[in-house]
A protein has these predicted regions:
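C-terminal helical cap and adjacent loop that interface with cofactors, partners, or active-site loops
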Residues: 11-16, 33-36, 44-45, 75-76, ...
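Predominantly a Rossmann-like dinucleotide-binding segment in NAD(P)-dependent oxidoreductases
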Residues: 69, 182-187, 192-305
């Protein structure tokens, strides 16, 4: 199947950033392409204004946080942020007043008294205008992340955004450009990079256990059919709508982030090209028909063009490594992110549980040997903060570790563990996979958001806490 110029512009956003009118609406973002010059991923160019790799903003003894989007993830984030030393929640915003009130309940116990904004789709902008906000923490629907992050940086705020950071290549480029021009951090909140086995395998890779890294695999296979077709779980069914008239890997970051760090993508290697293929939709359309037969509410979702059950994307890097990513949030399968690391000296695989390690073809190491490796390669961040993070919670503690390290870096004036180049690159897989699927699995060249700086950039993820690490969990 081939796409014409207009279709490509829709998927990549190269006809314009699509940043206007970014209110807190629950409706799905409709890209509004205009006729423009012919575009191809290989033609995408970013010219660096300032290298944000290793950038350390001035230290903030108290990090004043404005949270925008107080839904499922926003409330969970608030419950974690109030447990971190040096955090002050100064503003909350959501389209729905009841959501803001629920957010207020999350922080009131810890003596935070934030300003509240919920009187319209543009109210979130008032949070960005406030002088008592240092960090904007975004937990809004996907299509709002990039425009809100860009607006926040333009208003002198650091940004931490839920995943994905962007939906189009142009949004990715604009995020990078704005961060470079304003010298404001823009971090995508990829919590899996702080999960315990993922950090252990990163440490193992850095210390040479796997030898030369050859191949990695990641996935987001998580059955969300009932949640997507819920009347209440996602406001105005925004996540269901993201699955209509799109076909690709819509959520690659959970499987990709840790593998990208292990391969030093943006920091000594880079993605070269990607190919992607999707199955047909075997469930979302039929499920919509089944629901609509008994409830007129679901009739607008019948006969829609839903994305395929399974998407598989393969990436090749400049140094010849490969990555396989999968996305399926419909099929009745056990949860998996795979997390496979394959090198010339060893292999690790997290799913299906329990996690395993091997050093030859005869099989996985024994449980006893696994625990010996765990003791040897568990990084300092886990040893120092892991148990407290588990107590605070958030996907077993990784969410808390992520938030804790973000605040710790801001308080001590350190580079963040993940920067805007990571946010852009990992998010770019979404439009690139959509383009490749529509083109019959044709290769899509992956843009270099570092403008060549990847060859000299240094890895950021400080799992050994060589700097900072003194912020307390309360």
């Amino acid at each position: 199947m081939k796409t014409n110029r207009r279709d490509f512009l829709k998927m990549t956003g190269l006809a314009g950033a699509g940043l206007a009118g970014a209110g807190l609406t629950g409706s799905v973002h409709v890209r509004n392409p205009q006729q423009s010059v012919d575009a191809n991923p290989a033609d995408f160019v970013h010219r660096q204004h300032f290298n944000m790799n290793g950038y350390a903003a001035p230290a903030l003894d108290t990090v004043r946080v404005g949270v925008i989007g107080i839904g499922n993830r926003g409330r969970a984030a608030l419950s974690r942020l109030v447990r971190i030393e040096g955090v002050r929640i100064t503003a909350l915003s959501d389209l729905y007043p009841e959501a803001v009130e629920q957010g207020l309940e999350c922080v009131r116990e810890y003596d935070h008294n934030p300003a509240l904004y919920s009187n319209g789709e543009e109210e979130w902008k008032h949070v960005c205008d406030r002088e008592d906000v240092d960090l904007i923490y975004l937990c809004t629907p996907w299509h709002l992340h990039a425009p809100q992050a860009i607006h926040a940086m333009e208003h002198d705020k650091h940004v931490a955004t839920e995943i994905p950071a962007a939906q189009t290549l142009e949004e990715c480029r604009k995020l990078v450009e704005t961060s470079e021009q304003t010298r404001k951090h823009c971090m995508m909140l990829e919590n899996v990079c702080y999960d315990f086995f993922e950090m252990m395998t990163l440490n193992m890779a850095r210390r040479g256990f796997f030898g030369d890294i050859v191949h990695g695999e990641g996935a987001y296979i998580h059955e969300l059919l009932r949640m997507n077709f819920s009347k209440t779980y996602y406001a105005d069914q925004w996540r269901l709508k993201e699955n209509i008239d799109r076909n690709g890997n819509l959520y690659p970051m959970h499987g990709l982030g840790s593998i990208a760090q292990i391969m030093n993508l943006n920091y000594g290697d880079r993605m070269d090209y990607l190919v992607s293929v999707s199955s047909g939709d075997f469930q979302m359309g039929p499920h919509a028909e089944k629901l609509a037969a008994g409830d007129d509410f679901w009739k607008p979702y019948v006969d829609r063009n839903y994305r395929g059950n399974m998407n598989t994307s393969i990436i090749r890097t400049a140094k010849g490594r490969t990555i396989m990513l999968q996305h399926d949030v419909t099929s009745p399968r056990p949860y998996t992110r795979i997390h496979l690391v394959s090198g010339t000296l060893g292999t690790a695989r997290k799913y299906p549980a329990p996690a395993r390690i091997a050093t030859d073809h005869t099989g996985w190491v024994s449980e006893e040997e696994f625990h010996e490796l765990e003791e040897r390669y568990t990084p300092e961040i886990t040893r120092r903060v892991g148990e407290m993070a588990r107590e605070v919670g958030g996907h077993g503690g990784m969410d808390t570790l992520m938030d804790w390290r973000l605040i710790d870096c801001l308080r001590y004036g350190l580079p963040l563990d993940m920067d805007v180049y990571d946010a852009a690159l990992w998010s770019a897989v979404i439009p690139l996979s959509e383009w490749s699927v529509a083109q019959g699995a044709m290769p899509a060249r992956v843009p270099d958001f570092t403008d060549g700086a990847w060859e000299s950039n240094r890895p950021l993820m400080d799992i050994e806490l060589e700097k900072g690490g003194s912020t307390r969990l309360l």
